[in-house]
A protein has these predicted regions:
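Charge-rich, low-complexity N-terminal segments
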Residues: 1-96
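Long, charged/polar, low-complexity intrinsically disordered N-terminal extensions
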Residues: 235-239
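Extended amphipathic alpha-helical regions
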Residues: 65-233
Length: 239
């Protein structure tokens, strides 16, 4: 699955942003407001967040080590053979991609001072493609990603901030006629998938759940014969 990475400068007017100092809080607010104004002011089709640099570095390191995985998405209950309602799940295949580290926008002298401990160089920008597992199995590299997450690292060295942008793929009819209409994924599902990415790729704490998610990620890559899809379902529900 190949995508064309859109530069951050094509989304935010960095020249205007550089006209005066901005704090991380101000940039985060601008990022949120921009995406809330999309799709005729509904914000549909996009999700966004601001990620501290140290958090991103941890996730990126895990993504480089384990660049693919599958995460469960809860679905409406269905009846089993006995007529009992049973929770259903849909699996999504995710793939990390890593791109050239962006240069720090100039003139950097006009930026507010970066947080203590922030590196003088930017990390790599990264993307995560999420596709229904059945779609990926049937079409592999030609499969259509339903959600594309991009972690923009342009402001990492100046503000210790990573800007996350999620783009939900519109349906064919929507793309042709009404871009703000229908999408292959709901806003709620896009948020849940993003949360699942964080749960499996950002290890923190010492709980059994954290250890098991770590073990599942390792088994998926290193010992696939020990990997059990059923174990993923324990981590499907939002916290």
């Amino acid at each position: 699955m190949l995508i064309v990475l859109q530069p951050l400068a094509n989304i935010l007017n960095l020249d205007r942003l550089l006209e005066k100092p901005h704090t991380t809080e101000q940039i985060s607010s601008l990022w949120t407001a921009y995406h809330a104004s999309r799709s005729k002011g509904t914000g549909r089709g996009f999700i966004c967040a601001s990620v501290p640099l140290d958090i991103y570095n941890k996730m990126m390191a895990t993504g480089m080590k384990y660049p693919a995985f599958a995460v469960p998405l809860p679905r409406d209950a269905v009846q089993d053979d006995s007529g009992q309602a049973k929770r259903a799940y849909e699996f999504y295949f995710l793939q990390w991609g890593f791109h050239k580290a962006p240069q720090t926008p100039t003139p950097s002298i006009l930026f507010s001072k970066p947080p203590a401990g922030v590196s003088v160089s930017n990390p790599q920008t990264s993307t995560v493609l999420l596709t229904p597992l059945q779609e990926y199995k049937s079409r592999t590299t030609f499969a259509t990603p339903y959600l594309i997450l991009t972690f923009y690292a342009d402001l990492a060295s100046s503000h210790g901030l990573i800007l996350l942008r999620g783009e939900i793929t519109p349906t064919a009819a929507s793309a042709a006629n009404n871009p703000s209409s229908d999408f292959l994924l709901s806003q709620q599902d896009a948020q849940l998938l993003t949360m699942q990415l964080q749960r499996f790729y950002l290890w923190g704490g010492e709980g059994e759940g954290v250890k098991e998610r770590h073990r599942l990620l390792e088994a998926f890559h290193n010992t696939p014969e020990e990997f059990k899809w059923e174990d993923l379902l324990k981590h499907a529900e939002p916290v």
